[in-house]
């Protein structure tokens, strides 16, 4: 039986996934702007591309359909309605200011789709706009700015496709991102899901979010979201995802009978543990890898459908987070593999995404090669670790889990 579109678990057989290869946006990273763009360092882009293609090849070797975001966006831009939808939003007054649309829209609209997709993800500097297009408002802006400043900012964090949208069972969220450097990513991902033929012909729900709305204090990122199965969704609440957004997702899921409970992992906000999946991820049906110093401090909040005005009840569960997750799945407990090494090595490996692995099927995960101690412990626990190189890809603080947006994943029987 064919699995319907959606992420029905965290470890079932992965069927279909979206990734985004490092390209022009990463060539725009410099020592002076990388922190603002949420990277810790600049990348050797050619090497990052080589390693990312190796990652993709290893997934395809196992029969996984891998979609690349630049390619999907290019195919959306081949469609007149899709191209207009994207340009309307990328050139809106809130995105570029009044008057700019009139100066640059025709130039962008005349581009081949693959070139336009590259610029929409990679950014457009003022100096790249042809001289004959620098009229009116844009001409004044170029004199006020350096030619190397960006009219359309680059989006290097598209590399981490997990975050901008998240599939939860048979639907998807369009996520309002926490930091300005990432907020425009959701526009492009939304365009793909609403206009690309491979999605237009399939039946799925939109649980939450709108690329055009001002969500205020409601922020949500996919690295915090785990549809683990048995009607249970885990969501981290730390640096990136807020109670305001989490509760709206819960209400939507419960109102449509799509979930039976949500376990919110309340975490201290910290860059090293920006998302739940940086400290906790599933490797097998009953096995997780975790960073104990953070996971031990999680306060689990359990949300369940109710007749209350909000549409749900909430209670604090005093048990350890892993015990709450296990009982939600109908298990007596979870096997755990902690970040490897002594206290110093464990900190290093967590920072280098040792716990941020993505399951290709039960008991098979992709992880970074540099996390030797954690990978050895996973292997000892019976997990096959498919290693990919970390030296360049990891500079944005994201591993295999972050770099994949599962679109179709099999359920697991709990």
UniProtKB/Swiss-Prot annotation:
Active site (record annotation): 402
Reactions catalysed, as given in the entry: L-arginine + H2O = L-citrulline + NH4(+)
E.C. designation(s): 3.5.3.6
Subcellular location: Cytoplasm
Main location: cytoplasm
Pathway in which this enzyme or protein is active: Amino-acid degradation; L-arginine degradation via ADI pathway; carbamoyl phosphate from L-arginine: step 1/2
GO cellular component: cytoplasm
Alphabetical list of Pfam families matching this protein: ADI
UniProt keyword terms in alphabetical order: Arginine metabolism, Cytoplasm, Hydrolase
One Gene Ontology term from the biological process aspect of the record: arginine deiminase pathway
Entries under InterPro entries matching the protein: Arg_deiminase
One Gene Ontology MF term: arginine deiminase activity
Family from the record: Belongs to the arginine deiminase family.
UniProt-recorded name of the protein: Arginine deiminase
The species this protein was found in: Cutibacterium acnes (strain DSM 16379 / KPA171202)
């Amino acid at each position: 039986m064919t699995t319907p579109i959606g992420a029905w678990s965290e470890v079932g057989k992965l069927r279909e996934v979206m990734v985004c290869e490092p390209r022009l946006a990463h060539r725009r990273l410099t020592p002076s702007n990388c922190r603002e763009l949420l990277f810790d360092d600049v990348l050797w882009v050619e090497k990052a591309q080589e390693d990312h293609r190796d990652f993709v090849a290893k997934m395809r070797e196992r029969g996984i359909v891998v979609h690349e975001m630049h390619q999907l966006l290019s195919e959306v831009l081949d469609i007149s309605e899709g191209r207009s939808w994207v340009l309307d939003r990328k050139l809106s007054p809130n995105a570029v200011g009044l008057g700019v649309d009139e100066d640059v829209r025709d130039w962008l609209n005349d581009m081949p789709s693959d070139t336009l997709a590259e610029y929409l993800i990679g950014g457009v500097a003022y100096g790249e706009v042809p001289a004959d297009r620098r009229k009116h408002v844009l001409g004044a802006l170029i004199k006020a700015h350096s030619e190397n400043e960006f009219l359309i900012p680059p989006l290097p964090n598209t590399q981490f496709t997990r975050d901008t949208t998240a599939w939860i069972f048979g639907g998807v969220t369009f996520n309002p991102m926490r930091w300005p450097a990432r907020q425009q990513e959701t526009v492009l991902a939304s365009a793909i899901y609403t206009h690309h033929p491979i999605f237009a012909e399939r039946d799925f729900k939109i649980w939450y979010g709108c690329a055009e709305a001002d969500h205020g204090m409601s922020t949500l990122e996919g690295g915090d979201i785990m549809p683990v199965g048995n009607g249970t969704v885990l969501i981290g609440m730390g640096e990136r995802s807020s109670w305001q957004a989490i509760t709206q997702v819960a209400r939507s899921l419960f109102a449509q009978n799509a979930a039976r409970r949500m376990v919110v992992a309340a975490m201290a906000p910290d860059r090293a543990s920006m998302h739940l999946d940086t400290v906790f991820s599933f490797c097998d049906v009953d096995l997780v890898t975790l960073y104990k110093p953070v996971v031990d401090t999680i306060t689990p909040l359990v949300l369940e459908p109710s007749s209350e005005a909000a549409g749900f009840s909430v209670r604090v569960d005093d048990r350890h987070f892993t015990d709450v997750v296990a009982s939600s799945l109908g298990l007596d407990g979870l096997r755990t593999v902690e970040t490897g090494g002594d206290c110093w090595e464990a900190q290093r490996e967590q920072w280098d995404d040792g716990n941020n692995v993505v399951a290709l099927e039960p008991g098979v995960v992709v992880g970074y090669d540099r996390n030797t101690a954690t990978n050895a412990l996973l292997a000892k626990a019976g997990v096959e670790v498919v290693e990919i190189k970390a030296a360049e890809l990891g500079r944005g603080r994201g591993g295999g889990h972050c770099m994949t947006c599962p679109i179709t994943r099999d359920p697991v029987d709990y």
